[in-house]
């Protein structure tokens, strides 16, 4: 009898029925799996699972070697030379070469690509000129010295450059990527096994990955779930091992009844409402934008509406970035009653001669938490200023596209998670030439301060960036609401999870405790 059971176990295991599988919530459907078009967190998370750059992140969120085995920094920080791993291969067995990086970067910086995050490569020599069509992409400062050696030249010293190399925009591309990106070979710890939109993205272990022997999971199943309440229900039903987030207002309940599986950690990220300053009624109307900002009680939003340890935001850049003191907008030093009085004064001046109540559209992507925030903000605007608000809810891809085009948007859900630990990760979003500038804010002085900061170092550089943030907050193209914390539910059977301020948890470091069949 024991022999029969043993034989049955061996057969079942060989068929993959006891394969080590992790089930994860993803949040919204990825906006794109093209490394040069993806900009949402779900897409970036998936791309980091199936692809890898010269650098990557370890379980604690630290930058470590990825496809590169080693590197040296020369020319006082302006030249990087990388040696690729000898066992770096694509999932089809092809050798991964330095030319695969050159090909990818030239595509990222070609004007025709319209890469959404190409600005991250701006420190690279001729990168900005290439995106503007002033030079050919082949003139960009990246070249293959040999099949396994790569050289990158920068315009200026960029302390966070190694972090940028771990972003999808800096990943390599197989030659087949140019025609069939979803079917092309990948170089990450996993590869796509099954993709069913709005239902399941199934990843399987990539045996060609350079560190495949250290990856304990055989399969990772990601479930796109926009509604955090639905995600919570599926976690409680045993369908998920790890959630992407928790529902708004449920932190205290979860802490009381599910505290052993609740993981809350600091996070370098800001949540705000963006204002399309290129559309009426916000064009050349700073007083109206400031009035709307001052009328919002951020403490209520952070503590009661969201309620998971978030901090009220008075700035765009969050705390926690070494050497930088976030600036606060005018009026943040007042108590809420005084802020509301100032909001009324500014609103009256902004609406002088107009008797009809103002109607504003507030657009957000599908999420019960985003809806609660939108309802709370619209209630505050109504109570303090008499402003009416029309709430518009959209599926993630539609929302991202409308926000990018700026034809329909007035006020919209916004925010940013740091791509690297520097103020420019947030402030660069508002440069007039940024592809991610969804507020359509344009200020030559702001752009000049950002340009000047590029060639500065130390305290002088940080002071320039602080002046830029101060100017940005005076112009108020966004309404800061709160600073993020990461929030997950994690089954005790999941191993290898380490909280970190980047909230990056690659499945290659995770595992699932084996179950006895």
Per-range role (PLM):
Residues 136-139, 148, 153-221, 227-229, ...:
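Gly/Pro-rich hinge or "lid" segments in bacterial periplasmic/extracellular proteins
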Residues 97-104, 147-153, 188-189, 216-219, ...:
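Alpha-helical secondary-structure segments
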Residues 488-517:
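Long beta-strand-rich cores associated with HINT superfamily self-processing modules
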Residues 83, 100-109, 113-174:
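Surface-exposed binding/hinge segments that line
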Residues 25-75, 106, 185:
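N-terminal lobe/hinge region of extracytoplasmic solute-binding protein
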Residues 142-143, 303, 336, 387-400, ...:
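Extracytoplasmic/peripheral linker and loop segments enriched in polar/acidic and small residues
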Residues 312-349, 367-371:
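Structural transition elements
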Residues 340, 346-418, 433, 486:
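Ligand/substrate-recognition segments at binding pockets and active sites
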């Amino acid at each position: 009898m024991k022999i029969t059971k043993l034989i049955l176990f061996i057969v079942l295991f060989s068929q993959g029925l006891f394969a080590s599988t992790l089930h994860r919530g993803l949040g919204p459907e990825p906006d794109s799996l093209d490394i040069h078009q993806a900009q949402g967190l779900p897409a970036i998370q998936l791309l980091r699972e199936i692809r890898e750059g010269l650098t990557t992140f370890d379980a604690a969120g630290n930058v470590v070697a990825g496809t590169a085995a080693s590197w040296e920094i020369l020319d006082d920080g302006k030249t990087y030379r990388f040696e690729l791993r000898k066992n770096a291969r694509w999932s089809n067995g092809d050798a991964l070469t330095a030319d695969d990086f050159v090909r990818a970067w030239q595509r990222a910086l070609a004007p025709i690509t319209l890469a959404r995050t190409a600005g991250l490569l701006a420190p690279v020599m001729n990168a900005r000129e290439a995106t503007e069509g002033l030079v050919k992409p082949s003139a960009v400062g990246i070249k293959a010295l040999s099949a396994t050696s790569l050289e990158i030249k920068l315009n200026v010293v960029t302390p966070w450059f190694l972090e940028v190399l771990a972003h999808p925009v800096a990943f390599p591309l197989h030659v087949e990527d140019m025609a069939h990106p979803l079917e092309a070979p990948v170089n990450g710890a996993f590869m796509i096994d099954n993709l069913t939109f709005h239902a399941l993205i199934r990843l399987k272990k990539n045996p060609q990955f350079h560190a495949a022997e250290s990856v304990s999971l055989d399969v990772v199943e990601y479930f796109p779930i926009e509604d955090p309440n639905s995600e919570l229900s599926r976690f409680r039903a045993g369908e998920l091992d790890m959630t992407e987030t928790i529902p708004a207002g449920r932190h205290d309940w979860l802490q009381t009844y599910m505290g052993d599986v609740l993981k809350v950690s600091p996070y370098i990220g800001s949540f705000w409402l963006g204002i399309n300053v290129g559309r009426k009624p916000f064009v050349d109307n700073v007083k109206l934008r400031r009035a709307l900002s001052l009328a919002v009680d951020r403490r209520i939003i952070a503590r009661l509406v969201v309620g998971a340890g978030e901090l009220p935001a008075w700035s765009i850049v969050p705390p926690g970035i070494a050497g930088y003191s976030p600036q606060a907008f005018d009026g943040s030093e007042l108590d809420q009653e005084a802020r509301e009085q100032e909001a009324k004064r500014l609103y009256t001046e902004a609406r002088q001669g107009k008797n009809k109540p103002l109607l504003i559209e507030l657009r957000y992507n599908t999420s019960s938490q985003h809806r609660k925030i939108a309802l709370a903000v619209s209630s505050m605007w109504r109570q303090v200023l008499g402003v009416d608000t029309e709430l518009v809810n959209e599926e993630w891809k539609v929302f991202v596209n409308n926000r990018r085009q700026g034809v329909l948007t007035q006020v919209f859900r916004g925010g940013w998670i740091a791509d690297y630990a520097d103020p420019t990760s947030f402030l660069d979003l508002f440069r007039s030439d940024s592809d991610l500038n969804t507020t359509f804010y344009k200020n030559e002085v702001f752009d000049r301060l950002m340009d000047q900061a590029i060639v500065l170092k130390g305290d002088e550089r940080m002071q320039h960036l602080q002046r830029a943030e101060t100017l940005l907050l005076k112009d108020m193209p966004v309404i800061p609401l709160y600073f993020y914390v990461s929030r997950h539910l994690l089954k005790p059977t999941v191993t290898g999870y380490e909280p970190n301020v980047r909230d990056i948890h690659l499945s290659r470091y995770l595992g699932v405790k084996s179950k006895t069949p």
